[in-house]
């Protein structure tokens, strides 16, 4: 494995499974030490253990990304433990699907709080350190649903679409200090949820994807590595779509 992130420290939210876990492990294979953040200590520690098994340092933290005070305290602990942070991956996300007329305000708020407010809080918590060291990489995991919308997911689509505007605005604010800010928009990815999809539903979905396949969490991890590594040094304010050609 190439060591393009040798001795850098990456914070990954939503690291307990799926895309977050894949990013944590790929970054570790590329030489990074990883801070694994998720809602539960069990999930965070499990992935941190996998990172350590790859020969890298790892720290596990459990926090609600939408709780500003808790995140600020966690960020302080992370900086104290790790000494510095070079990369922030805002990946934490949830869904609370439902048609507009049936969606509760609580379900709307829960999704916006985690998917959008969480990225804002974490980015703000580490931006001072990035500005001080005059370097840093921030990568926000959005979704193609934020580009095209989806019936029954107006809350999720709104949160993911807003991440694009957030990414571009922060890229303009932090760019002069050597900090890049980009977004990745995954398409349909093989997850626990898609594993239980009915065959006929899966077949219909594949018709919309020119590559005729769902992506894997590792596909998103490779895109994140590209943006976080030396190859991404002159890229900022952009959204990289990784969806098998579904959105063109």
Write out the residue ranges for each language-model feature.
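Conserved glycine-rich cofactor-binding loop
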Residues: 9, 16-18, 40
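Conserved glycine-rich Rossmann-like NAD(P)H-binding loop of the short-chain dehydrogenase/reductase
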Residues: 32-46
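Residue(s) in the substrate-gating loop at a strand-loop-helix junction
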Residues: 143
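Active-site helix of classical SDR
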Residues: 123, 159, 167
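C-terminal substrate-recognition "lid" of short-chain dehydrogenase/reductases
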Residues: 120, 131, 135, 213-242, ...
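Substrate-binding pocket helix/loop in short-chain dehydrogenase/reductase
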Residues: 99-100, 107-112, 205
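Alpha-helical segment proximal to the catalytic Tyr-Lys
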Residues: 128, 172-176, 233
């Amino acid at each position: 494995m190439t060591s393009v992130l040798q001795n850098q420290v990456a914070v990954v939210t939503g690291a307990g499974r799926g895309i977050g876990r894949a990013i944590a492990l790929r970054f570790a294979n590329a030489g990074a030490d990883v801070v694994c953040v998720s809602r539960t200590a069990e999930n965070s520690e499990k992935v941190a253990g996998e990172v350590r098994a790859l020969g890298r340092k790892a720290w596990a933290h459990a926090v609600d990304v939408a709780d500003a005070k808790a995140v600020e305290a966690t960020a302080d602990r992370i900086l104290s433990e790790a000494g510095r942070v070079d990369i922030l991956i805002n990946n934490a996300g949830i869904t609370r699907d439902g048609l507009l007329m049936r969606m509760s305000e609580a379900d709307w708020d829960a999704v916006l709080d985690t998917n959008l407010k969480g990225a804002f809080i974490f980015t703000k918590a580490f931006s001072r350190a990035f500005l001080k060291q005059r370097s840093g990489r921030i990568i926000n995991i959005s979704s193609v649903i934020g580009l095209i919308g989806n019936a029954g997911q107006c809350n999720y689509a709104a949160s993911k679409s807003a991440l694009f505007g957030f990414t571009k605005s922060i890229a303009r604010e932090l760019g002069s200090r050597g900090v890049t800010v980009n977004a990745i928009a995954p398409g349909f990815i093989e997850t626990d949820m898609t594993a239980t999809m009915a065959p006929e539903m899966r077949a219909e979905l594949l018709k919309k994807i020119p590559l005729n396949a769902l992506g894997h969490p590792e596909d998103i991890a490779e895109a994140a590595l590209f943006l976080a590594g030396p190859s991404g040094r002159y890229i900022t304010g952009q959204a990289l779509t990784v969806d098998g050609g579904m959105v063109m």
